[in-house]
Amino acid sequence: MNWTTATCWALLLATAFLCDSCSAKGGRGGARGSARGVRGGARGASRVRVRPAPRYSSSLRVAAAGAAAGAAAGVAAGLATGSGWRRTSGPGELGLEDDENGAMGGNGTDRGVYSYWAWTSGSGSVHSPRICLLLSGTLGALELLRP
């Protein structure tokens, strides 16, 4: 997962976590008993209770927070180990896997164009502490990162 993808997922999940409606009340709250009328009163009513599912459950919020923290940790681990995603060479540029197919008269179907490795790896490590600091500051403000 590259920086852009990790950042987008972390921000998307943090937004979903922050914009979650907290007005849904769980458990036994609100008007009960005779305040509900004859059918919903405590006397003579069945104990079967139909409750609509909440819009977002607590487990979804926990999963979103965990995924955002995991994405931030993955990005930070990539920075710490120095492993980064390398940019692939474009048309007309010499890449790591150039061979006779890239030369004049070649058919241009070498591994550098069609291999999975060429599209998912790059040539150097990426050092951008600003994104890591932004994510850790955001997650720290949300109290999702605990020392």
Curated annotation (Swiss-Prot):
Glycosylation sites: N107
Membrane topology: Lipid-anchor; GPI-anchor
Compositionally biased spans, kind Gly residues: 26-43
Coiled coil: none
Gene Ontology terms: biological process: protein import into nucleus
Main location: membrane
Residues excised as propeptide: 123-147
Lipidation (GPI-anchor amidated glycine): G122
Signal peptide interval: 1-24
Record's keyword terms, sorted: Amyloid, Cell membrane, Glycoprotein, GPI-anchor, Lipoprotein, Membrane, Prion, Signal
Subcellular location: Cell membrane
Chain intervals for the UniProt region annotation (Disordered): 26-46
Pfam families, per the entry: Shadoo
Annotated InterPro entries: Shadoo
GO cellular component, one term: vesicle
Domain of life of the source: Eukaryota
General function of this protein: Prion-like protein that has PrP(C)-like neuroprotective activity. May act as a modulator for the biological actions of normal and abnormal PrP.
Protein name: Shadow of prion protein
